[in-house]
A protein has these predicted regions:
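N-terminal binding-site loop/beta-alpha segment at the start of enzyme catalytic domains
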Residues: 20-158, 163-167, 171-174
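Beta/alpha (TIM)-barrel catalytic core signal, keyed to glycine-rich beta->alpha loops juxtaposed to Asp/Glu
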Residues: 57-75, 108, 132, 214, ...
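Short, low-complexity, Lys/Arg-enriched N-terminal segments of secretory-pathway carbohydrate enzymes
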Residues: 1-17, 49-51
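Active-site mouth loops of central-metabolism enzymes
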Residues: 95-107, 194-210, 239-240
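Short loop/turn motifs at secondary-structure junctions
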Residues: 86, 120-123, 149, 221-224, ...
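Short, acidic/polar
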Residues: 103-116, 205-219, 270-278
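Acidic (Asp/Glu)-rich catalytic clusters
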Residues: 118, 142-150, 218-222, 278-283, ...
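Glycine-rich, positively charged active-site loop/lid region within alpha/beta enzyme cores that binds
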Residues: 88, 96, 165-198, 306-337
Length: 337
């Protein structure tokens, strides 16, 4: 990516990071992941075009040096030894489009997507969680405004949270399923621009995944997305619901029977839960894994996941290789100050 612009830190402020340092960090990070890939051997390649954050084999992610600091990651796929990464290997992570940590605007979101498209990036990763649907809306609007060629553009989104109008949420859901920490006004909410008329309801069941998928298509205003990632199934209740509750099976059905998606994926931070999910489901269940913040210069907890994915032929989209911006002058690590 261009070293002519300063990398934007996680708090949505332009940091005075020296361009040369940003470039060096990117090269170091990519070299680390290339070394792992060449030692392990080639994995499976994601179906054409398209880290987010930032799938198939070991991926390396780095921050897009635009004013918005949307994150990106690269998939090494089954590249032969000596094959250099290109812009085609990058995925733009779209949580910053919703204004993570600080308020942003639709115009900034469009500028970010336009810069990515101009650079040749054609793959985008978003989620309902990012601004309670705001990232999806802004991404869809930006792709249309920028005239993106959707025949060459791939979009990934996530399932596990259903965004419901407040008047639709039941008393029982408010008691046990609403993720209150992600509602505007709560000190834990990191998306200040999120709408105030919806609530995030945790739902990792098959019907919940199906509704989340349909709602995402409506917000994006797209006929389809390429991949659905199970998002943050990192406690025992969510994990059990995704498996025993039929969530994983529903995604496989959407891919294999209905041809509604091309990839069944994971979008998680905890490497231990990623590996459990892989091991507790049959080979061929997952096409890719997005693992955030678990394989970078500060944290290598995800090493075992990389080897397990290599063994199974599962692509890895490695997100957060700059440790939530901490390695490039930011003030957050693992999404916390």
């Amino acid at each position: 990516m261009s070293a002519r612009r300063s990398t934007r830190a996680s708090n949505d402020r332009v940091e005075s990071l020296a361009p040369n340092l940003a470039h060096v960090l990117a090269v170091i990070a990519l070299a680390v992941f290339a070394a792992i890939h060449f030692r392990a051997g080639a994995g499976r390649v994601a179906p054409s075009s398209g880290d987010a954050s930032d799938s198939k084999s070991v991926s390396a992610g780095f921050a897009i040096p635009t004013e918005k600091m949307a994150s990106a990651s690269a998939s090494l796929g089954s590249h032969p030894a000596g094959r250099k990464l290109t812009v085609d290997d990058l995925i733009l992570g779209c949580s910053p489009l919703a204004g993570i940590y600080a308020s942003s605007t639709p115009e900034r979101a469009t500028e970010t997507v336009r810069a990515a498209l101009d650079a040749g990036i054609t793959r985008f990763d978003t989620a309902p969680h990012y601004g309670l649907g705001l990232s999806e809306r802004r991404l869809g609007d930006a792709l249309r405004e920028c005239g993106a060629d959707m025949s060459k553009t791939r979009v990934y989104t996530k399932v596990g949270r259903v965004m419901k109008p407040k008047d639709e949420v039941t008393a029982s859901e408010k008691e046990s399923a609403v993720e209150w920490g992600n509602v505007p006004g709560d000190p834990g909410c990191i998306f200040p621009d999120a709408p105030v008329d919806v609530l995030p309801v945790l739902d990792y069941t098959g019907p919940g995944f199906r509704r989340s998928h349909a709602d995402s298509l409506a917000r994006l205003r797209l006929g389809s997305v390429d991949g659905l990632r199970i998002h943050d199934a990192e406690d025992e209740a969510r994990y059990a619901q995704a498996n025993a509750g039929g969530g994983v099976a529903e995604l496989v059905k959407l891919r294999d029977d209905e041809r509604a998606i091309r990839e069944v994926s994971l979008g998680m931070n905890d490497a231990a839960f990623v590996r459990r999910m892989l091991e507790d489901n049959p080979p061929g269940t997952f096409d890719s894994v997005m693992m955030a913040g678990a394989w970078n210069l500060l944290d290598q907890d995800g090493g075992d996941v990389l080897w397990e994915c290599e063994r199974r032929g599962v692509a890895v989209h490695n997100a957060g290789i700059f440790a939530s911006g901490l390695l490039v002058g930011g003030s957050h690590y693992k999404y916390a100050p």
